């Protein structure tokens, strides 16, 4: 079923849903550059004001995946993505990027999808470059890196070239649109497992249901009640879990796992160099907030990656992986391997 952009805009104004096939059609028009900037911006704002539904987001994510340049691996059902929507305004160091080295050292194969800073002080690509990684890898080289080191990093702009057709509209609008929540749903390696941080509590229930419809295996969507798009030490964390096709929503607290509840002030950074320092401190097992929040998020990733039966077991494994030096060694191994491909 097709729908014109004008008809879709009328639906948004009347707070009525755009159906799945209609949303597929509209997204394909957007990704092919077949809408004028005026109509595209009106539609994106209409969806935002109406509030995007699970069905609309699912259809949009399917189209973005359709247009993406894929990374082909033998076992996508075992891969884990760790990323956040960003936009939480917390300006903390790159927690999930650090945690991926811990999870990988614990045996979880990582296919991380990320980019440069949009609203934070340091995006995942920014800090990985500061740590010495080469990110200009072809899809085949990313797949090789996953096979060899247990980690692959997919630089989002390199895999979503069709986004160039909506980039000027997004930039001029300067506010969040559906695309801010689509990035973490469109992993080019089709990773079936995921730890995703979200900037708003409402997105916990929404994103977990979208990934259920998209066929994910084991997913944890997290939002710190202090506003972080990570599991937080400064508050309880809301969790939406998809496992074996079933969804559960609950809260976790640092004290549940023997961690102290502490402010996140000590892990705020102004640039990628400051973020790099905290990454190294955490992986070098320097006691403090940076190490503990990395361990907490790595524990959730290890659990989402199906290495343990409980979050508690996964957190113990995360601390062990940091303290025995294997997480820091994984960082060095990954960076060295990516540099093999430098021209």
Swiss-Prot record:
The keyword Glycosyltransferase applies. One of its GO terms (biological process) is L-tryptophan biosynthetic process. Anthranilate 2 binds at residue 170. Binds 2 magnesium ions per monomer. It is an enzyme of class 2 (transferase). Mg(2+) 2 binds at residues 229-230. The keyword Metal-binding applies. GO terms for cellular component: cytosol. Disulfide bonds: none annotated. Belongs to the anthranilate phosphoribosyltransferase family. Homodimer. This is Anthranilate phosphoribosyltransferase.
């Amino acid at each position: 079923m097709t729908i014109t952009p004008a008809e879709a805009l009328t639906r948004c104004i009347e707070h009525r849903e755009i159906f799945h096939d209609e949303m597929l059609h509209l997204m394909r028009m957007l990704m092919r550059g077949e809408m004028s900037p005026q109509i595209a911006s009106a539609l994106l704002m209409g969806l935002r004001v109406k509030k995007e539904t699970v069905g609309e987001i699912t259809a949009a994510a399917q189209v973005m995946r359709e247009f993406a340049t894929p990374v082909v691996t033998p076992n996508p059902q075992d891969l884990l993505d760790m990323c956040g929507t960003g936009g939480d305004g917390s300006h903390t160091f790159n927690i999930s990027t650090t945690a991926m080295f811990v999870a990988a050292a614990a045996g979880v194969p990582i296919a991380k999808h990320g980019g440069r800073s949009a609203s934070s002080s340091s995006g995942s690509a920014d800090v990985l470059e500061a740590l010495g990684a080469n990110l200009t890898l072809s899809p085949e080289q990313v797949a090789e890196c996953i096979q060899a080191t247990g980690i692959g990093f997919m630089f989002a702009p390199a895999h979503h070239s069709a986004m160039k057709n909506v980039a000027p509209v997004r930039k001029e609008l300067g506010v969040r649109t559906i695309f801010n929540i689509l990035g973490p749903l469109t992993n080019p390696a089709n990773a079936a497992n995921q730890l995703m941080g979200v900037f708003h509590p409402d997105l916990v229930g929404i994103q977990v249901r979208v990934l259920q419809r998209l066929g994910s295996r084991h997913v944890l969507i997290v939002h710190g009640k202090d506003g972080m798009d990570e599991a937080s030490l400064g508050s309880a964390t809301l969790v939406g879990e998809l496992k074996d096709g079933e969804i559960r929503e609950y809260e976790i607290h640092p004290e549940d796992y023997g961690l102290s509840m502490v402010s996140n002030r000590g892990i705020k950074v102004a640039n990628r160099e400051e973020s790099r320092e905290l990454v190294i401190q955490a992986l070098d097992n320097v006691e403090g907030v940076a190490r503990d929040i990395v361990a907490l998020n790595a524990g959730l990733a290890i659990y989402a990656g199906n290495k343990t039966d409980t979050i508690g077991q996964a957190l113990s494994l995360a601390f062990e992986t940091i303290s025995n030096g294997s997480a820091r060694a994984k960082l060095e191994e990954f960076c060295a391997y990516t540099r093999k491909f430098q021209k």
